[in-house]
Design a protein with these regions (language model features):
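Short linear sequence motif anchored by a di-proline
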Residues: 1-227
């Protein structure tokens, strides 16, 4: 499961890295503690213009066939995205990339759960594989655009903390994923050698704590740094 992450790279830099037009105006501020049901940035692909765009979607996919917006999914298991009722249509037609600079998981210990930040060794941003969909309110006729983060088997690093991890796509697969050219075969664990996991402050437990202090080193004696 992936239920919390951060995005601290600004939109202008994301545009340079991921090849989409720079937005005329900044859309969302950076965040150190992104939680479900919040608006997030996602990169989508327009098959008509063959261009990428940066858009704001709500984290928690509401299926297009849902009677209301109460049912939503924050994660989609990679193994079932082509069979689970909510995901086949977006899997085939509505894929996205979700920029991040790190994600958080909690490791169970005798002393309680210890939060970890899992990130790239070089501190660079990366993208989760995602799906998006549109749901129309039957009363107001307004459209709600939502998204989900795909999860899969953990790599050796994350397996020490949790049984699953978000699917991180390497750069050479971005175009294949967005265009729909690939299947589930590219949804693999990201290489362990490129990542680190470090214990951080328990302030991260509350989504309202959204500042750099949530990344301060945590209980090293109990947790230890995972490399």
């Amino acid at each position: 499961m992936c239920g919390r992450y951060r995005r601290t790279t600004r939109e202008e830099e994301l545009a340079r890295i991921y090849h989409f037009p720079i937005p005329a105006q900044p859309d969302l501020p950076i965040s150190y503690n992104i939680a479900p049901n919040q608006p997030i940035l996602a990169i989508r692909y327009n098959p008509e213009t063959k261009q990428r765009s940066l858009d704001t979607l709500l984290w928690g996919l509401v299926p297009y066939w849902s009677k209301d917006d109460k049912t939503c999914f924050i994660n989609a298991r990679a193994e079932r995205i082509d069979t689970a009722p909510a995901f086949p249509r977006p899997f085939h037609k509505r894929r996205c990339l979700i920029p991040a600079d790190g994600f958080y998981e909690w490791k169970k210990t005798p002393e309680g759960k210890i939060p970890y930040s899992i990130e790239m060794k070089d501190g660079s941003p990366f993208v989760f594989a995602g799906l998006w969909d549109g749901w129309q309110n039957p009363g107001t006729k307004e459209w709600l655009r939502t998204c989900v983060i795909i999860t899969g088997e953990p790599n050796e690093l994350v397996a020490q903390i949790h049984t699953r991890m978000p699917v991180i796509l390497p750069p050479e697969t971005h175009e294949q994923w967005l265009s729909g050219e690939s299947g589930k075969e590219i949804l693999r664990p990201f290489p362990t050698k490129e990542m680190i996991a470090r214990p951080i402050s328990k302030r991260i437990n509350k989504p309202e704590n959204n500042d750099p202090s949530v990344l301060e080193e945590g209980e090293m004696e109990q947790a230890g740094r995972l490399i």
